[in-house]
């Protein structure tokens, strides 16, 4: 290539698009922090003993166009065939108004979990709609705002039954007609809780002494039966009964809640979310009022703001793992907010009548198929069904299945049976094609006419739904596309996302989610595949997954990866299981002590508790490092039973601990394993790696370091990497499992497969040099922010040379003592300046943790620093008595447009200071839509359903 051609090459252009500061800005920043060069800063920050000895070996960086061409080759290897497998996954139509305005819209997918409710009212409303939808369709009292997938929700239901029940039994009963992938995830969870899983016929439940049970309704083979008596008899025996159900079926069949279920779980996938070869999808859980504080996952509640107006918030947050730690109800952190929002909008768009029509059509098509088959001499396993039939095909099974495959049709292959599931996309042509496979000569129209006289004959009368659902006005207002488009925009406008400005949340890595990375997500070649389709039809997914795993191994220094875990917390769980199985394989199953530094993320102790480990806390010194003396003492005390240590690197205090290799060596010498939490991998890539440091296993947050967007609270992915000795203990899967069939942690083998292309695309476009540069720039940005703020705020922890890693902790405690202004006041005041708050009170109470990421440019960093410095000056005015402590811009923050227009302004500061405190806000202003939300009121007056219409009229 000539010199001119080389100079005009745009192959590496993406790196400059992804990283915020250009070269000139980097030089200014380096001057501000007194570093000679970027490499000099890295040398001062990252301990020499953990620096990689050679660069990562990855393919040359690709341009956006080349990357999309490469990923299209993977997509083209996938074969999208007509699929009638069912088993919890169905084709669906994603309404285009939702596809374009939500799934493909950075205003929705780049937001963070709504911990700051004043700037999250839009998606809080949508998630409240989701809860209302689930409550209505299941017939239950309260629902959460989503879980990771149906199988995980079932495992969570099991632990809820154990916590909430009065039985002393250790048995959990699972009906043998529950989806097989769900049973496997339950078995994994039960093993480490010490529960005995008994699998049997539904009718055996009342005779089984069990603390809890899981039934499937309709069953995995499609049967619809009245479970009322079975549930009542089990409950009389102190058994809490959970039921896995189908939301679309619940539009026609009697809801599980009306049959007496204590817990109802399932997946909302078929409400407009593509199958995506397994995910991501929003699961749900609903329960009775008395179990609300035992229910895992996030719950949206109705509260009031400082003016007494209705405001939404996440309720009962004290149940969450970051507060309860090893006593938490679950280790769940990431949920599936974006997918829950899509499902809730599906219900809003269609309403009761639309959902019922979709259900009627699906059922009618199934009834036509069943009638044609039975008239042609085939026997059905069940004559009562909604959308799924199972045909007793005996010795013809393999021949019929092969005939279907030859016709490019996927059916469910069972032992001597074939299953067929229909959905909203099923056509008359599909039925004709199936009739041809089974040599049925009947006419679809004639069969339809016969059935019309008794449309619901296949649903037993006791199982027919008579109650209304989706009667709230929100589900009966937005049925034209214009109405829906405006409703979606109205909600989006209430929320702060990366489209508005920096989200400097420490430990969350809110970096750019580039448009090019997102494009393949909605391609049907990735979206329309059933996770249990024959593996050869998913050759593209297999190749992409293997290539991504190889890339991740190179980046992390590990030898093997599993992509199955659907979140960081799920990855932690899979990683600790791998450690425990390894110990068991060596006859050391007694090793159950997990050492966790006091600075650790709350998920760590919560996960350790889920694997029945005894958590022993290791002290940190005054600089935030692991106290080696205390570590040595704890290792000596627990040496015989030491299983592992869980560390985060760089530490959650935002520094590179010098002695991390020594920590690993000490634990290994005592027979333990090292779990390195990958939450802060964004400060490692290309500079060091978990494998090089000496760790045995890590999860990676693909939704942090590797650019999968946070989606306003999910999806996420938490794949785990391991050294070779732990590779045999990675999660398996009953369908297409590469690592064997046991110890699954997710419903599908590749977890949320359809978002894997995002991380693959990011790595492909950055290349080894680009990824390394991103890490360096993330460190530069953090140190720049730290140095600009240090004259005004105490910085809690810094490394040996006075540097921080990719985030820094600002200590508000001494300032609160001095001025009376808290970290919460600062967080809320930042909203007036057009920012999302940093992480509050983690890992140290009374602090703010700031992580700017590499994607923010110098102008945005300065805008943030200027806002923080201005807020510090406002605090001084409170201290000096210019503004009273109980009435100032900080304690009254955030301010809304309604505040600005108040006729009576009874505050000692002008409206301009309240609403336009900086020059930047006069140019462009994001407005919170409510005043400060009253958390105490919300939890004392818990309402987790949609408010009445009068609240909207106000």
UniProtKB/Swiss-Prot annotation:
One of its GO terms (molecular function) is glycine dehydrogenase (decarboxylating) activity. GO terms for cellular component: cytosol; glycine cleavage complex. InterPro entries: GcvP (IPR003437), GDC-P_C (IPR049316), GDC-P_N (IPR049315), GDC_P (IPR020581), PyrdxlP-dep_Trfase (IPR015424), PyrdxlP-dep_Trfase_major (IPR015421), PyrdxlP-dep_Trfase_small (IPR015422). Keywords: Oxidoreductase, Pyridoxal phosphate. It is an enzyme of class 1 (oxidoreductase). Coiled coil: none annotated. GO terms for biological process: glycine decarboxylation via glycine cleavage system. The modification N6-(pyridoxal phosphate)lysine is found at residue 704. Its cofactor is pyridoxal 5'-phosphate. It catalyses: N(6)-[(R)-lipoyl]-L-lysyl-[glycine-cleavage complex H protein] + glycine + H(+) = N(6)-[(R)-S(8)-aminomethyldihydrolipoyl]-L-lysyl-[glycine-cleavage complex H protein] + CO2. Its EC number is 1.4.4.2. SUPFAM superfamilies: PLP-dependent transferases. The glycine cleavage system catalyzes the degradation of glycine. The P protein binds the alpha-amino group of glycine through its pyridoxal phosphate cofactor; CO(2) is released and the remaining methylamine moiety is then transferred to the lipoamide cofactor of the H protein. The glycine cleavage system is composed of four proteins: P, T, L and H. HAMAP family: GcvP. Belongs to the GcvP family. PANTHER family: GLYCINE DEHYDROGENASE (DECARBOXYLATING) (PTHR11773:SF13), GLYCINE DEHYDROGENASE, DECARBOXYLATING (PTHR11773). This is Glycine dehydrogenase (decarboxylating).
């Amino acid at each position: 290539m000539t010199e001119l051609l080389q100079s005009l090459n745009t192959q590496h252009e993406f790196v400059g698009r992804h990283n915020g500061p250009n070269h000139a800005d980097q030089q200014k920043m380096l001057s501000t922090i007194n570093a000679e060069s970027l490499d000099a800063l890295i040398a001062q920050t990252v301990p020499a003993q953990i620096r990689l000895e050679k660069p990562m070996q990855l393919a040359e960086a690709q341009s956006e166009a080349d990357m999309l061409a490469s990923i299209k080759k993977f997509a083209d290897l996938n074969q999208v065939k007509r699929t009638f497998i069912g088993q919890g996954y169905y084709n669906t139509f994603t309404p285009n108004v939702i596809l374009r305005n939500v799934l493909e819209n950075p205003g929705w997918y780049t937001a963070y979990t709504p911990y700051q409710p004043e700037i999250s009212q839009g998606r809080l409303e949508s998630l409240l709609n989701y809860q209302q939808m689930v409550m209505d369709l299941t017939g239950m009292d309260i629902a959460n705002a989503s879980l990771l997938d149906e199988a995980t929700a079932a495992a969570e239901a099991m632990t809820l039954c154990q916590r909430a029940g009065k039985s002393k039994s250790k048995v959990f009963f699972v009906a043998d007609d529950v989806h097989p992938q769900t049973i496997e995830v339950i078995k994994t969870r039960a093993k480490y809780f010490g529960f005995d899983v008994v699998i049997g016929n539904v009718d055996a439940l009342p005779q089984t002494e069990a603390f809890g049970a899981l039934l499937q309704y309709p069953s995995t083979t499609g049967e619809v039966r009245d479970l009322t008596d079975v549930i009542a008899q089990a409950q009389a025996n102190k058994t809490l009964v959970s039921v896995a159900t189908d939301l679309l079926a619940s539009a026609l069949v009697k809801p599980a809640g009306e049959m007496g279920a204590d817990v109802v779980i399932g997946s909302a996938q078929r409400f407009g979310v593509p199958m995506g070869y397994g995910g991501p999808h929003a699961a749900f859980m609903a329960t009775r009022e008395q179990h609300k504080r035992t229910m895992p996952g996030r719950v949206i509640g109705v509260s009031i703001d400082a003016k007494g107006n209705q405001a939404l918030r996440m309720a009962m947050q004290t149940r969450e793992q970051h507060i309860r730690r090893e006593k938490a109800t679950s280790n769940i952190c990431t949920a599936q907010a974006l997918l829950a929002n899509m499902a809730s909008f599906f219900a809003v768009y269609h309403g009761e009548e639309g959902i019922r029509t979709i259900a009627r059509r699906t059922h009618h098509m199934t009834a036509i198929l069943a009638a044609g088959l039975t008239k042609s001499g085939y026997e059905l396993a069940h004559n009562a069904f909604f959308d799924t039939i199972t045909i007793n095909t005996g010795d013809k099974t393999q021949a019929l299945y092969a005939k279907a495959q030859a016709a490019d049709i996927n059916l469910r292959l069972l032992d001597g049976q074939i299953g067929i599931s229909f959905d909203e996309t099923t056509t008359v042509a599909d039925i004709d094609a199936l009739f041809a496979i089974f040599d049925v000569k009947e006419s679809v129209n004639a069969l339809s006419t016969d059935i019309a006289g008794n449309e619901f004959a296949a649903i037993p009368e006791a199982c027919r739904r008579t109650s209304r659902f989706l009667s709230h006005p929100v589900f009966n207002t937005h049925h034209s596309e214009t109405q829906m488009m405006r409703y979606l925009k109205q909600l989006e406008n209430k929320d702060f996302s990366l489209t508005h400005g920096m989200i400097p949340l420490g430990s969350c890595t809110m970096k750019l989610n580039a448009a090019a990375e997102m494009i393949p997500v909605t391609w049907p070649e990735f979206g329309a595949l059933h996770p249990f389709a024959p593996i050869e039809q998913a050759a593209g997914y297999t190749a992409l997954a293997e290539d991504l795993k190889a890339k991740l191994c190179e980046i992390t220094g590990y030898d093997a990866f599993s992509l199955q875990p659907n979140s960081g917390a799920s990855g932690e769980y899979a990683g600790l299981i791998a450690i425990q199985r390894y110990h068991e394989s060596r006859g050391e199953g007694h090793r159950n002590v997990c050492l966790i530094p006091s600075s650790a993320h709350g998920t760590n102790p919560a996960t350790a508790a889920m694997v029945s480990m005894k958590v022993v806390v290791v002290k940190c010194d005054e600089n935030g490092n692991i106290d080696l003396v205390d570590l040595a003492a704890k290792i000596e005390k627990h040496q015989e039973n030491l299983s592992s240590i869980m560390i985060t690197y760089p530490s959650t205090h935002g520094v590179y601990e010098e002695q991390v290799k020594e920590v690993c060596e000490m634990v290994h010498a005592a027979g333990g394993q090292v779990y390195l939490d990958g939450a802060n991998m964004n400060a490692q890539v290309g500079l060091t790696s978990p494998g090089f440091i000496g760790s045995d296993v890590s999860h990676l947050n693909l939704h942090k370091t590797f650019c999968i967007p946070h989606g306003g609270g999910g999806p996420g992915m938490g794949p785990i990497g391991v050294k070779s000795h732990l590779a045999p203990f990675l999660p398996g899967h009953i369908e297409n499992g590469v690592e064997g069939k046991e110890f699954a942690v997710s419903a599908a083998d590749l977890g949320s497969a359809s978002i894997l292309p995002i991380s693959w695309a990011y790595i492909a476009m950055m290349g080894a040099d680009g990824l390394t540069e991103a890490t360096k720039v993330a460190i530069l940005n953090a140190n720049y922010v730290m140095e600009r703020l240090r004259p005004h705020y105490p910085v809690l922890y810094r490394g040996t040379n006075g540097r921080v890693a990719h985030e820094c902790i600002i200590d508000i405690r001494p300032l609160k003592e001095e001025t009376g202004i808290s970290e919460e006041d600062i967080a809320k005041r930042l909203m007036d300046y057009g920012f999302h708050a940093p992480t509050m009170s983690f890992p140290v109470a009374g602090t703010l943790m700031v992580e700017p990421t590499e994607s923010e440019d110098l102008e945005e960093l300065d805008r943030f620093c200027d806002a923080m410095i201005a807020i510090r000056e406002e605090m001084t005015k409170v201290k000096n008595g210019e503004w009273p402590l109980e009435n100032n811009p900080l304690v009254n923050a955030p301010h809304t447009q309604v505040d600005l227009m108040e006729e009576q302004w009874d505050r000692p500061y002008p409206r301009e200071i309240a609403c336009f405190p900086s020059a930047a806000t006069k140019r462009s202003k994001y407005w919170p839509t409510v005043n400060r939300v009253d958390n105490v009121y919300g939890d004392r007056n818990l309402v987790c359903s949609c408010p009445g219409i009068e609240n909207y009229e106000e």
